[in-house]
């Protein structure tokens, strides 16, 4: 019996740290293969999937800025880090015979296609996995904001936020506070008012204004992407 997706089109947001695994830096080949297998499994269902990968496993713009670098330069370096991650994920997906396209906000024709909204949608309609890289092409904006913007542009039904060190949204850091409560459901306004660190406030406000749901869950548990796509109750669901 064919497995049915709850959503027609999803955006999967992965932090760069999720690809690093326990090492905290670089790309862990075991982790990226696991993520690719999960994404490929979803792509075979009746669900179109786009992926946005952060670059924190290689470089963080804020880190460079804190060290005295020009913030714009540091952020552009971070965008290039996301391209490295995107190409690594594309390679892992193509090894699984999963048709994949990388689209970058900064033009680099030799390695990827330039981001064009209509082209991205067409790739999704053709059941290709689309990986968005290089953020939105401007400094001062996070990859969380990229996920929110691209989800609105391609009219995704939900943003799936795969985390590497937490299995949902908590009232406090569960590693520090033993009394921290895990939320099964939140609203965007609650998330903003309570200062819950799901994504930055720019991205959170954008999701609220454009009525984009979020599902926050652990990427480290095998099969969780598929479970989220099928509508199983995992992690924390955030809606308007």
Curated annotation (Swiss-Prot):
Binding residues for ATP: 13-16, 56, 60, 164, 170, 173
Record keywords: Allosteric enzyme, ATP-binding, Cytoplasm, Kinase, Nucleotide-binding, Pyrimidine biosynthesis, Transferase
Location of region: Involved in allosteric activation by GTP: 21-26
Presence of the UniProt keyword Transcription in the record: no
A GO cellular component entry from the record: cytoplasm
Known catalytic reactions: UMP + ATP = UDP + ADP
Localization annotation: Cytoplasm
Highest taxon, organism lineage: Bacteria
Enzyme class, first EC level, given as a word: transferase
GO biological process, one term: 'de novo' CTP biosynthetic process
Binding residues for UMP: 55, 75, 136-143
Record entry for activity regulation: Allosterically activated by GTP. Inhibited by UTP.
Record GO terms (molecular function): ATP binding; UMP kinase activity
Main location class: cytoplasm
UniProt-listed Enzyme Commission number(s): 2.7.4.22
Family listed: Belongs to the UMP kinase family.
HAMAP family, A to Z: PyrH_B
Subunit comment: Homohexamer.
PANTHER family, per database record: URIDYLATE KINASE, URIDYLATE KINASE PUMPKIN, CHLOROPLASTIC
General function of this protein: Catalyzes the reversible phosphorylation of UMP to UDP.
Protein name as it appears in the record: Uridylate kinase
Organism: Staphylococcus epidermidis (strain ATCC 35984 / DSM 28319 / BCRC 17069 / CCUG 31568 / BM 3577 / RP62A)
Upper lineage: Bacteria, Bacillati, Bacillota, Bacilli, Bacillales
Gene: pyrH
């Amino acid at each position: 019996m064919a497995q049915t997706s709850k959503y027609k089109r999803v955006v999967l947001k992965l932090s760069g740290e999720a690809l690093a695994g326990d090492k905290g830096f670089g790309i862990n080949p075991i982790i990226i293969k696991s993520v690719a297998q999960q994404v490929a499994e979803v792509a075979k269902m009746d669900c179109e999937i786009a992926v946005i990968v952060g670059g924190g496993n290689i470089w963080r713009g804020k880190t460079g800025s804190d060290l005295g670098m020009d913030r714009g330069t540091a952020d552009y370096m971070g965008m290039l880090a996301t391209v490295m991650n995107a190409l690594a994920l594309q390679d892992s997906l193509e090894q699984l015979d999963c048709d994949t396209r990388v689209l970058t906000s900064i033009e680099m024709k030799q390695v990827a296609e330039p981001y064009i909204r209509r082209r991205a949608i067409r790739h999704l309609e053709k059941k290709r996995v689309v990986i968005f890289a290089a953020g939105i092409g401007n400094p001062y904006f996070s990859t969380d904001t990229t996920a929110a913007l691209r989800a609105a542009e391609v009219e995704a039904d939900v943003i799936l936020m795969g985390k590497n060190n937490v299995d949902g949204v908590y009232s406090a850091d569960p590693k520090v506070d033993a009394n921290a409560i895990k939320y099964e459901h939140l609203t965007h306004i609650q998330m903003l008012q309570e200062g819950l660190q799901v994504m930055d406030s720019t991205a959170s406000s954008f999701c609220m204004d454009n009525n984009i749901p979020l599902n926050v869950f652990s990427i480290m548990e095998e099969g969780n992407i598929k479970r989220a796509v099928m509508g199983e109750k995992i992690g924390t669901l955030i809606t308007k």
